[in-house]
Amino acid sequence: MRRPPPLGPTTASGPEGNVRNLRKRQAPGPGAAGGCGPEAGGRGENRQKRRMVARATPGRGEVKSDKSVAASGAGKAARRRVEGRRGQVSPSDRRGLEAAKEAEFPLQTERHTKEKRKVTEASTDDPQPGFDLVRKESLTSSESFQTVECLRSLGKEGIVEGIKRRIRNKKLKSLENPPLKITENEATQNIKVEFQDELYKNTLKYSCNILSPEVENNFVFKLRDCNCFPHSKDCNDENNLPYEPDGGCMHVAENFSKKENFRSLAEKSDTNNIPQLLQTEENVMGVNKLLPEESDLYQSKINGLLPCLQREKNKYSIEESSVGRKPRKRMKLSEKADETVTQMNFSNEYNKSELMLQENQMIADGKEAEAKSPLNVLRKVSHNTVSLMDHLLSVPEMVEKETSSEHHVNAVFQKTIEPLLKEETENASEPLGYENMALKEDFKSKSCIGKSPEYHIERRSSREDLRSDSEELKLSCQRTIPMTGKRTWPYYSCARISAWCWKKASLPESSYFLPGSQKSCKKVDVPKHQTNKTHLTDSKLLLQSSLTETNTESSSKEKLDSNLNCLFSVSAVEHTLMVIKEPIIKDDKKIKSEELSRSGSEVISNTTEDTQLTSDTQSLTGNKKRDRGNLTKLNLTAASKDGQEANNSTGKTIHRKACVAKQTFVVPDLVKILNTGRLTNFKIPLLKNKTKKRKEVNAKSSEREAYSPLELLDNLSGADTRQNRSKENVSMTMLGPQTLSIQNSVTPVQASSDSFYNKNSCSISPSFTKHGNSSKPSNHFSEPGNIVSNKEVASLTVENNAFSSDPGYVEKSPSFCCNKQETFRPVSSEVRGRKITKNFSEVGFPDILKAYEDDVLLIDVIQDDPDLFGVSNEGELSFTSEVPRISQEPNVPGEHQLTDSKYVETPVKKEPSDDLRELPVLDCGPIKPDICASNSAASEIRHDPKDANTSLGEVANETSENETLGDFSEQIKGSDLDEKHRFTDKVITKEEKENIYEVRKSKDSRNADIMVGECQFAAPVPKPLCLLVPPLNLSGHQEDTILNTWMNDFRFLGKHSVLKLQNPETCEIFKREKNVGVFQKSLGLMIPYKYCKFHFNTLRGCERPLCKFAHVPEQGDEKVCMDVFKKYININELCLLQRAVNVFMEYYRKFPPGIYFDLQVLNDLLNSLLKHCLLKEVFQIVNLSIMVKMLPSLKILLNIFEHVATMKLRNAVPALIDIFCKLVEAGMVLDPEHFNYIVKLLYQVQASKQEITAVLEMKSRLQMRQFKKNWKCDLDSALNKLEHCKEKGDWTKLGKLYINVKMGCEKFADFQTFCACIAETLTKNCEDERPDTPFCEFAETVSKDPQNSKVDKGVLGRIGISAMYFYHKLLQWSKGRKVLDKLYELKIHFASLKGLIGPEKLASRCQIVNVAAEIFLKSGSLDGALWVMRESEWIIDTPLWPCDRLDVLNRHNLLCTIAHETLAKSLYRQTFEVLQNLPGFQNSQETVEVSQYSLLFNKLLGSCIESNSLGMSSSVAEFMISKSIPIDFSFLRRLITSLGRSRLWLKARAHYKSALSLGCYPPLEGNLYRKLLLIPSYLSEIEMLLAIEIFMVSNASSIQSPGTSTQILQIVLKRCEDNQSRSNDDYQAAVERLIMAARISDPKLFVKHMTVNVNKEQVYSLEHCSALKWLKENMKWAGKVWLFSNH
């Protein structure tokens, strides 16, 4: 159970009490440490501490010497006992260790004093007064903590309590300026003091904890086989630490508790934490010196201590889970902010403050942890385990709690880490005094962390706790108005900036998790971490202003945390989220809600876990910018935990001064870490309803909870502290394996930068990573250029953070990457770093603090204000792009595996018009679970998708996230080096030499463009810098990580840009853009409605995935094309020119050039493309123009050659030569000098001999063509050649002569004359008996010409007609037939042509066809004659082709001849076709009498009937009847009978009816209605049946009426007059046919014989029933057939 805090003013709750206590603490005096004996040392002690630090930094030897000096007497003996024995430490041993502790404590005190002085000096440099106060406070608190720890080591609990009170008072005094923070800090300090007391008791119980609190702080021990020991706040818990076989490997004896306590403290009060952190840093520095010796002692006892520690840890975790939720809630916002501030400050004062902060924070955390529930403490513990820095911070408290066990563990870690720490300390000490201490701690943390990769199990539990806490936060966390007492802004107020800082401690306690636990916790805490990250970012914003003061302390603490986190921040993404949530554990619900709200506003999601960490770090360094709210935009905090951890550690080194100076703190490792994290596109949320949205955000959305920069200014004291805490938490989370590596990697970027930068900058040597838990850190950031530079980096830069991550740093510290940074995606960070760096370089944010000092009026506007920025969906562009979602939700290990030891490169495609503000930030995305933390981070991301999905705010207009996303996977595969070089080249080569980023004002003064040096970031100016981060080197585990690209818009108040998304929300964003006015102005084109106005009439073009309007002009709209081309050419924008190319290609591939085609437009377009070096597009257009026979000018061709030669585009030469040859072949004429110039250019490009030879061949060919042209144009010479060919009968040569003349003759008249001469030549002298035909040989030669065209066919056809007439005249049918066959072979349709000479030149078409048909007939080719007729379409005389009567007569005779021949061959169809086309049938105007054709048709009809061709017979009969051609009735009756017998009743009835109309049968009208039918006996049975049908239908009414059944229907078989000569047999046969007719009817009819009339004619009666039945079945069709006429 935790001890109740001592009563007194120091413990007074509420802001007043805290303020009073802070004021007391701030009271000046030599006993700034609170009057504690050891701490009361004057400057002499500080000097001694400095000297000791200097000794510790040079190397292990010095450290060991310091340790030996420090450890004297019983202390040494105790250590020996401990080292000699690894079993359970006995009480005596513990006492010995404590004695050693006491011996070492003075050294620690001195160290603290030195660090205090350093801090004080640094603060004096700061332009803002708040810094000095904070630093003093931190020193005081650190001294008091040291005193308390000394007393604890002595076992004087009572004295410790008194000291605690003093410390509280001092802290309260020091924190007087920020009343709210002071109150929170005071409470936190009280808790810390109490917790320290308890820890001290525990320490007494566990005497094995010999190391001083400082030493313990520095120790983080990770055992793969051991579980992480969460240290409960209560001493009893620590004593009863149970062993947890969770597999948590990290055993941080006191680091865990300290972390927990520190976080709790940070959550409660940033200010208190800061002083404590400073003290802790000092203590830690002292501890670093003592570590080597103590580590030896601890190593001997590790085995025994681990089980104890594990038990205690388990126990503490259990107790923490059950204890102190309410206190934690009380401290939610303030503590979180404090932790963030502390972390930032910690990173600023990384070395000095780090130690002091560690002790202070650990003490404060211990207290806070006591106040908080054990669960929170446990979470913190796990987080502490995660981040070595956090462990170090938590060591003091841990010392008290898990005194002996944790000390042993710490000792072991220290031993392991000592060498690393020494190296790191040396590296750090060189650049910065603070760095030495911080590096030591980092190394210690690293080694410890590296030892316990299995810790993730416990982290998982802690994450779960964090989740629960975050859930609580979600429920309870609302955007609270700062407690500073200064002006507050309502949620809807325009004064509240979009980048609202999280008032609650945004840092999750997850940062306290051990790496192993972090992994497990990541899954659970991802949402929280994300939220916390967002909080961190916001808090950083708030903190940045106040952090400038508190930043030193908090940054020191953060440094430790971040260093530790760096180790774990390999899984930094998850860690970061965890960190954010750690402070939330206290106010878990609030924090979670805050996280959610923040992540909403900042668009920080699970993906942004790392970004949040980065943002925290950045906010630490760039608190001012963060305060602006831009920090919130950055969201880089979560982007890369690892980077942030590194950054945090660095940032911790960074002092307030640096923050105040706004100098960008260059932390390459931090940048890497930032890159590792998934940076959601941090965009200022646009809220439809400011009030509503703000409330939602504040109350429960937990997606975004931001504080206005104004509030930040007001709340700097309080909110900054919270932010520092949250940042510290973040850094703790980042403290994973990455933290250590980060510190090593980090090197001072720019000493020239403000002191803030120098302080903040921490050099991290590659060895640091190596010394870290494993080589994994190096794997992650093994590449020096690897920096978490994506959104995270951007966030840092934007924040004005001293963290202008320097690629150089990262490069310097390839080992920066923690082993577990596998989770962290350096590749993505690299990629992001580059692109983000570019974007960030363009982004600039006003510094609130600086503006305040300069008396500048800063107007804070909520970017979600619809009045100002339009209404966006859900108050902001929900950045739910596929990539962010992937990074958040699908943070599956598999995704992380995409990048195999390759640098993930996420290019952010930015159009030239992108404002510098518009910064696309790449989200590192979830890191592969290879790092336990990364795995959990992925789960966490998945768990808290809405944070990731929360709107990014505004995205750069020009930035195309889709592109970024599309290329993301490939870039991940890409190498960091490539991207790094690419990025560096793009940014500025000058900066490569300088190795710094130069800040240049962008279009918007708020935007700063940072130049990338050789992987280094420099912050030369206090202006807000955008971190350009070179691509991170994704090594080892990072290979598996996948980066998710995010677009981050860090614009402060600029125009809103729209991020192109590849998801269904694109349309909504499109609408938003439209509302906001993001679209560019119309280009002024008059585009028809059916075409997309965005595609044609805007610079950006159409962004709709499915546009209902056309993007390519349709046929007939060539004028639109030309107008578009002209406009685009005038504007001369690259994107428009490319669009013009697409339109040109799409249109002219489908449609040929029309009347609106302008060759000058084509030439201008090609020139514009050449100017923009779009050679590929030029080739495409030229090739297409050749196809459509629209050749560009010769000047364009020469310009293309010049461009290729100038640009040395050797690869383009083959394609260019091909185009050149095509142009020459198409008719382009070049002079010899042009050829010589082209050859010269080709030599410059070093073209091959073959290519140059091809050009020379074209030259010779063109010259020959010109020579032939001159010769061909000589008509006289051509005619002479013609005569020569005629004389020799060389018709083949004549054909070649024709081809040459055709190619060279310019005048068509001359060509016609020449062709007429050829026709005459071919027809003369052909009277001989030679079988050959000159025309055929000539036509064969001409037809073989490859350039043979329709003109040639026309000429050959006309010459052939002349030859045909010639042979027809001579009756040489065979030769004429050959001519016609050749024309048929060549598919020359001569029927539509006329001859060239003679009468055929004026012949009608009918005549030409007649001649040809006659030739075929005379030659015996009936098919040829029919072919000629069909080809001529049987045309005789038409208005278009008139002819004379002789031609018609000739045609009639010809067709009759053909008909007789075909009919003789039984070709009935061909005969009928010929007869149908006889003159008189085609044209009604023809005066030919068609009745004359009766014989022909009847002959054909008879032939068809005889051959039983019923179909043809029926067609002929119908045609004859229709044309009124007399028909033979006998043929017609035969046809009807044949059709009936063939059951073709329809045609039989039709023809019978026609026959009746023609008079073929006697009329029936008179007899039908008398119920009497007269049937001639000569009719066939078919004809009789048809007559009966007509009879029944005519009398149907009488037959069907009732009562008429008695009526009789009589049928008389009439004898014909002319049949009298016929015998009775014929009549009897007629009777039988009648009976048969009745039978074949369907249904059958019954005819009954009645009598014989006077004429001896048989009379029959038709039975009524049968007739009635037939009518019922057939009346429907019978009525139509017989009662109605067909015409």
From Swiss-Prot:
Residues 598-622, 948-963 have a biased composition (Polar residues). GO terms for cellular component: cytosol. Pfam families: Asp_Glu_race_2. Residues 1-132, 596-632, 938-969 are annotated as: Disordered. Keywords: Cytoplasm, Differentiation, Spermatogenesis. It is found in: Cytoplasm, Cytosol. Residues 31-41 have a biased composition (Gly residues). Residues 80-113 have a biased composition (Basic and acidic residues). One of its GO terms (biological process) is cell differentiation. PANTHER family: PROTEIN TOPAZ1. Important for normal spermatogenesis and male fertility. Specifically required for progression to the post-meiotic stages of spermatocyte development. Seems to be necessary for normal expression levels of a number of testis-expressed gene transcripts, although its role in this process is unclear. This is Protein TOPAZ1. The gene is TOPAZ1.
